[in-house]
Structures are given as C-alpha cells and as structure tokens.
Curated annotation (Swiss-Prot):
Organism: Rickettsia akari (strain Hartford)
Keywords carried by this UniProt record: Cell membrane, Heme biosynthesis, Iron, Membrane, Metal-binding, Oxidoreductase, Transmembrane, Transmembrane helix
Disulfide pattern: none
Family: Belongs to the COX15/CtaA family. Type 2 subfamily.
Protein name: Heme A synthase
Length: 337
C-alpha cells in the first residue's frame, strides 16, 4: 500500500514535469514567453477576465522591447493568444509544485516516506523553488534592452526541469521496479559505464538544444548532413576556439550536431552491450532504446530541414526525455543487480 501510494504520486509528478517541459518548449517556439511581464506567484493565478483587465495587461506588454521590435501593431486578440499560452505554462508550474508538495508533506507526517529516504525528495523540492526563480530570471532578461531571453538562462531553466524529472523518475522506478536477477558471473561493468556516459551526453545535448532554441539557431543552415556545402561552416572555421562563439547561432548549431553524433554512438554501443548479456529485460530495454534513438534523430533532422515546425520540434524535445528515461531505467536495473 505504501509503495503503491508513492508510485502513483511520483508517476503523476513525472507526467506533470514532462508536460511543463513540452509546453515550455512550445511557449518558446511561438514567442509567447515574454507576454506576461510581471512575476506574481500568488496573485497571478487567475487570468484577466474583463475587457479592461485585458487592456491593462496589453498596455504593460507594449511598454517592453518585444512589442516595439517584434510585435508592433499586434491586436488585442493576437496578444490574448500568446498571453494565454504563457499563462498556461505558469499555471501548470504552480499545479506541478502543489501536486508534488502536498502529498510529500502528508507522506512525511504519516511516515509513509521514512526520514532516511527523504533526501532526494527534499532536493527535488528545493529545485522546484529554484526553477520558479530561474523561470522569472530568464524572462527578465528579455524585458531589458533586447526582446529575446538569454539563451544561457533558458538552457539552465530547462536543465533544472530535467534534473527534477530525473530525481522523481529514479525514485519512481526505485519504488516500482524489481531488482534484476542476473547470474553473478555476468559482467555488467561495461553496460553500467556506457549507460552513465549516455546519461551525461544526453544532458549535454539537451543543454545545447536549449541554446539552439534560445538563439533561433535552428532557422539557419537548414540542410543535412552538411551545413550548406561544408562539414564545418566557414563562419567559424578560422575562429573555432573563441568564447564569443557561444553567442553565435552557427557555432551552437554545429556543436549541437556534433552532440547528436555522440549520443548516437554512445547509445548504439550501450545497445550492443545490453544485447550481448542475453537477459530478456535488458534486451527489451535495448530495443526500446533503438526505437527512441531513431525517433529522436529523425525528428531532429526533420525539425532542421523544415525550419523548426512547432509540432515536430516539440516531439523532438519529448523524445529526448523519453530516451533519457529509458537509459535511467537501464542504469538503475544494472546498478541494482
């Protein structure tokens, strides 16, 4: 009963975090992220209802750079569309925190979760608090002189969400999954190492993907596998090792492409390691990994070739989380055997 309660709670929390990541990505891709120019964690829980309140929100938006530089002449109806998308993103964030923290308090005082097991849940709670601040810190960067958010703040905002998901998902499978029964003579060192490496490179790739989104780097060099006619674009070829490149969309797209090759290579090696063990559950994970990897790569290529269609780009982001989840599951099973 205790495990069942925790499992259901963690499952819902994981789904909510995934929804937050996907809707956050859509908010970024549609340019809706700067439509709400205030941070009101408590009083901002309700949207405008009257015509006058909508006009007031629109007037606030007009006072900031994005309206004058990007959306000048936007109608109130058009403003409502981007406002409501950002509002849903923020509302979902509040709901996610409530869905996480209320049961956590209950479980703690009812001794459903033991004191010795509380650390990861407390870390996740602290990260939720940091995430709320980071979201506003990111938005604030686009309300100053430039009508675009800092791509670094955007990337950290995403990575914090992924770390929260990682913690919750690991606790979920820890409560839900049985330990693998593998003969003691079976060598699991190599798949354990490569699953750890795979998790690391996917984290890096997710971070780079956020930089690509923040710089609109997916809207240039819409060709594959070459960037135009070159493997290394001419803009960065003669000045590759320069910190200024971290603000260059061409360089960031190039590094993200390299990251995708790294993910492909590491995951394929991991799949081979899992298949050589000849264990039914690990073999099943290997097949899931290949499907998720192929989906992730194909949606990434389509996103690039067609200049970032929102639906495909969102699916691409979702499969990054799915791929990471499968590898976390794999790592847990091997590490616990």
């Amino acid at each position: 009963m205790r495990k069942s309660l925790i499992t259901k709670w963690l499952f819902v929390s994981c789904i909510m975090v995934i929804a937050m990541v996907v809707i956050g990505g859509i908010t970024r891709l549609t340019g809706a992220g700067l439509s709400i120019v205030e941070w009101r964690p408590v009083t901002g829980i309700l949207p405008p209802f009257s015509f006058e309140s909508w006009q007031a929100e629109f007037a606030k938006y007009k006072a900031f750079p994005e309206y004058n530089s990007v959306n000048y002449g936007m109608t109130l109806s058009e403003f409502k569309c981007i406002y409501l998308l950002e509002f849903i993103h923020r509302l979902l964030g509040r709901m996610t925190v409530l869905i996480y923290i209320v049961p956590l308090i209950y479980f703690y005082f009812k001794d459903v979760i033991k004191n010795c097991d509380m650390l990861p849940y407390i870390i996740a709670l602290l990260l939720f608090c940091v995430q709320g601040f980071m979201g506003w810190y990111m938005v604030k960067s686009g309300l100053l002189n430039s009508p675009s958010v800092s791509h670094f703040r955007l990337a950290f905002h995403l990575i914090i969400a992924v770390i929260i998901y990682h913690i919750l998902f690991y606790q979920l499978i820890k409560n839900r999954c049985d330990i693998l029964l593998i003969p003691s003579q079976t060598d699991l060192k190599l798949p354990l190492i490569f699953s750890g490496i795979a998790i690391t490179v996917i984290y890096v790739q997710i971070f780079l993907g956020a930089l690509v989104a923040g710089l609109d780097a997916g809207l240039i060099y819409n060709s594959f596998p070459l960037m135009g006619d070159h493997c290394i674009p001419m803009e960065i070829k003669d000045n590759f090792f320069n910190l200024a490149n971290l603000h260059d969309p061409v360089f960031i797209q190039f590094i993200h492409r390299l990251g995708s090759y790294s993910v492909f290579l590491v995951v394929v090696v991991l799949v081979i390691c899992l298949l050589t063990i000849e264990h039914p559950k690990l073999n099943k994970i290997a097949y899931f990994l290949m499907i998720a990897l192929l989906m992730q790569i194909s949606t990434g290529i389509i996103t690039l070739l067609y200049s970032v269609p929102i639906i495909i780009a969102s699916i691409h982001q979702l499969f990054a989380i799915i791929l990471l989840s499968i590898i976390i599951w794999c790592y847990f099973l091997i590490n616990s055997s």
